Structure formats: C-alpha cells, structure tokens
C-alpha cells in the first residue's frame, strides 16, 4: 500500500509538472495577466515611438559606404532633383535641374564670351525698307466741270469811274450801292469789277484761258478811254466746279460720322458743307447727289477733292 501510494504521489507530481510546463509553453503571460503594467518613472513611450518613426523614414545618417558607387550616385541625383522639383511646383516655372546643379566651368565661360564676340563682329546686312502696299482707290469715272473762275489783275493806274461808266458800253456805276464799275462783255461771257485804285476782278469764265482773255479785253477798254492801264499780276483766286454722283445721299449719317469736317443745317441751307483739309476745298453736298466744289486755286485740286469724297459718299448711298 505504501508503495502504491508513493507511486501515485510521484505520478501526480509528474502530471502537475507537465501541466505547468505546457501552460508556460503556449501561454507564457498567463500567470501575469492580472498584473498591471507600470511604466518606469521618467520614461516617455510616445517620444520613443515618434523617434523610431523618424529613424525609419530618414536615411540621411545611414552609412551607405558599403553600397556600390552607382547606387550612391542614384541616391544623390534623387536628393538633388527633389528640391528643384518642389521649386518648379511652387513657382510654376519649369527649370532644368541638371543645368542648375552644374555651374559653368572656366572653359565654358571662355567659349561663351568668344561666341558673343563673334556675334558682335559679324557683318550686319542692311535691310531694304519695304513700302506698304496701299489698296488702289476705286475711280469714280466722274469729272467735275468748271462753272466759274475768279481772277484778279492790277491795271497799275488811278481810274475815274464816272468817266468809264459814261463812255463805256455795258457798264454801270452806282457808288451808293457798290464802289466799283460793273462791266460785262459777251465773249467770253464774263463780268468785271473795276475799282478806282486800278484793281480789277474778273468773274464768270469757264476756264483759265477764258478768264485771262476776258481780263485783257477789259484792260483794253480802259486803255481806249485814255487811261495808261497795264496788265500786271494776273492771278486766279478761286475755281468752282460741280458734278453729280447719280445717287441720293444720307446727309444725316454723313454729318454724324464726319462731325469734325462737316456741318448740316437743313433749316438754314439744304446742302451739307464739307470742309476738306487736303486739298483745302469746301464742298456743298446735296441729298440729290449734286456736289459743288469751291476754293481751289488749280484745276487739279478740284479733281483730287472729288476723288477723295466719292468713296465717302458711296458709303452713305440711300438704298431706297
């Protein structure tokens, strides 16, 4: 009995040791689950964790000398590209990192200066200025007709207007109305104003030659009456021409568009007054399309003024 009891106690002891060993093997913290974890005084686990994170991401302090040279070069290139890429992203300007990271060498600087000096010493080929092409203006095909020419001449002598009015034909003199003798001839059909100072104005001729011829005829009449008349300083003072554009014109639109040059008061005068600057001509434009040009000293000014105004009038043609 004693032997069996001792054997049983031994087996029970072995079983207890096996159970205790298995529990420590598979659940080693089981005996300590009920114990609370107490941190050591002066220890901060959060700072330790953050420090570990920083160490895990920052490899700048890691010794990479054991790596091959090509891997070290790639790492350096990546570090150089990172700030340049951030700069490009912030500023919006595309920069070449390879050019920024590699400064000019002395030889490259010398080559650059030589290139610039070569550019300065290169001969400059003179450029011929091109005259801009101006569109050819549409010709009107209309030639204004001269209606009146006013000319002046100096007879260079004092005249007795009463004697001229009494002895000359087709002459009238009324000093209360006008202080000049009004004389007319039929060929060319003109009128002369003769003043006592010897100045004479001839008007009504249709051409320059007719105006000169008429002035000479009036001077001959004065000579025949006993005055020492001469023929000096003949000059054409004004030429008047007229034409028809053959279409009605919107004068209201024309005066609004060309306010600086034109005036239109239909209650006072039915025509629009257009004062052209070059040539210095005054035009009277009517709704019917009739145009009167005055103020010219030469025939060419009449033609030039009409060619300038014709495209403008065509732009204000009435559609109905």
Curated annotation (Swiss-Prot):
<dbReference type="InterPro" id="IPR033710">
    <property type="entry name" value="TBP_eukaryotic"/>
</dbReference>
<dbReference type="GO" id="GO:0016251">
    <property type="term" value="F:RNA polymerase II general transcription initiation factor activity"/>
</dbReference>
<dbReference type="Pfam" id="PF00352">
    <property type="entry name" value="TBP"/>
</dbReference>
<dbReference type="GO" id="GO:0005634">
    <property type="term" value="C:nucleus"/>
</dbReference>
<keyword id="KW-0539">Nucleus</keyword>
<comment type="similarity">
    <text>Belongs to the TBP family.</text>
</comment>
<keyword id="KW-0306">Gastrulation</keyword>
<keyword id="KW-0217">Developmental protein</keyword>
<dbReference type="GO" id="GO:0007369">
    <property type="term" value="P:gastrulation"/>
</dbReference>
<dbReference type="InterPro" id="IPR012295">
    <property type="entry name" value="TBP_dom_sf"/>
</dbReference>
<dbReference type="InterPro" id="IPR030491">
    <property type="entry name" value="TBP_CS"/>
</dbReference>
<dbReference type="GO" id="GO:0006351">
    <property type="term" value="P:DNA-templated transcription"/>
</dbReference>
<keyword id="KW-0238">DNA-binding</keyword>
<dbReference type="InterPro" id="IPR000814">
    <property type="entry name" value="TBP"/>
</dbReference>
<dbReference type="GO" id="GO:0006352">
    <property type="term" value="P:DNA-templated transcription initiation"/>
</dbReference>
<comment type="function">
    <text>TATA box-binding transcription factor. Members of the TBP family are differentially required to regulate transcription and development during early embryogenesis. Required for gastrulation. Regulates a large subset of genes that are ventrally expressed. Binds to a subset of promoters.</text>
</comment>
<protein>
    <recommendedName>
        <fullName>TATA box-binding protein-like 2</fullName>
    </recommendedName>
</protein>
<dbReference type="GO" id="GO:0009792">
    <property type="term" value="P:embryo development ending in birth or egg hatching"/>
</dbReference>
<dbReference type="GO" id="GO:0006366">
    <property type="term" value="P:transcription by RNA polymerase II"/>
</dbReference>
<keyword id="KW-0804">Transcription</keyword>
<keyword id="KW-0805">Transcription regulation</keyword>
<dbReference type="GO" id="GO:0003700">
    <property type="term" value="F:DNA-binding transcription factor activity"/>
</dbReference>
<dbReference type="GO" id="GO:0003677">
    <property type="term" value="F:DNA binding"/>
</dbReference>
